[in-house]
Amino acid sequence: MARPIMIMGCSSDAGKSFVVTALCRHFANRGVHVAPFKAQNMSNNAAVTPDGAEIGRAQYLQALAARIAPQARMNPVLLKPSADTESQVIVMGQVDHAISAMPWLERQPRLWLIVREALYSLMRDYEQVVIEGGGSPAEINLRTSDIVNMRVARECQADVYLVADIDRGGAFAHLLGTWHCLEVEERALVKGFILNKFRGDRALLGNAMEWLYERTGIPTVALLPMVRHTLPEEDTLHHRAHPETQQINLALVVYPYASNLDEFDPLVHEPGVTVVPICGCERLDAYHAILLPGSKNTVASLRYLRQSGLAAEINRAVQRGVPILGICGGLQLLGREIHDPHRLESGDCPGLGLLDLTTTLVPDKTTRQRQVPWQGTRLGGYEIHHGQTQAGEGVQAYLPDGLGWCQDNVYGVYVHGLFENAPYRQQFLERLGWRGQTTGEWSAVVDASLEQVAQLIVESGWII
């Protein structure tokens, strides 16, 4: 196989995931059997592979870009923050309670063996592996515990490319400074610089790329423009307003440890629909519906809702008849009680009491893809949760098989990804008064964006 390609960034959110995704589709379009890899990801936005493994959403998308099935070995270690100093550790797609309980530095030797094995298995099975780094390789304080950046590059002798976000400013200083922080043998692996999110005329750069080359001997191989696309962000929500046609305002309550926010992207991109992240107490009078996303720590999220005053606002909205939809952790928040006998989070806690449900958190995690019967069709989605929920007499089934309940204008479901299904999205919005036609199945929208970003690689002139 060809030497692995590794994309590292000068900072978080420089564009590493974006470039890896574009490269995966670029290689796939050329007929190359390509696979993505990220040794360790930290995110509460997770996805479920066909065989029930849990990986980061970014690597899931990159696998789709490569036109292959997502696999656990593409993201062998996933850290899901559940408190300021705590993370659940997902190893090869499954929760590892023993490693989760270990101090950070004690974990790394064990995790490195797993990372190394996953990487080499991909290198054996694919013609090309495109690797994503984490954060920045210039974090000197993290060098001894590194299992995601230069240690990976040295292990497989990858061709490394450093990417910087030029839209933020300071890109050339970031590239030069990052390169200077690398060891001599690590600099030898760096084959090029990438400037991401460039706006305007290339002439505005003047001789900056030549200046950088004179000091490093490293060429700038690609200048990627700022583009609007529908690809999900790794840890945030797309926020796009449609002021001319605005009909529906949706409030998305973003509490601490909120997860899988990208599943609301299909709503964001519908004409006339605005999804507004609510990150502090504010009046919810102006919204047609309120959305409660998943949570990695439902008890902490409940505490936040009560302390911020949002719990009272949500209750007032329910009394006015505003529809409330909670997904996964959001469902659990809406119930009467959350029992935590194993102290997976923070102990027992009363819920908002808007659904007659009682949830018990258990060590075994449910992770699986689902096809849910719904009004003569099937809705694709996935489950990721520790909770087992018992329904009382006050609720009715909203989805079959214990996957969702409703009580008056309050709805709760365990299935993520429902809004990716055009029929469900259409009906949800129409019930709020929306008069439009959906953009269609979300998978087709995303695939069109994958083609769009892959074309940027071609147009950049990057020979790779």
Short names for language-model regions:
Residues 335, 339-342:
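Extracellular/periplasmic helix-exit of transmembrane alpha-helices
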Residues 328-329:
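Catalytic nucleophile serine of serine hydrolases
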Residues 1-318, 323, 340, 363, ...:
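Flexible phosphate-sensing "switch/lid" loops adjacent to ATP/NTP-binding sites
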Residues 332:
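A Zn2+-metalloprotease active-site environment signal
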Residues 344, 349-368:
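Conserved P-loop NTPase catalytic core
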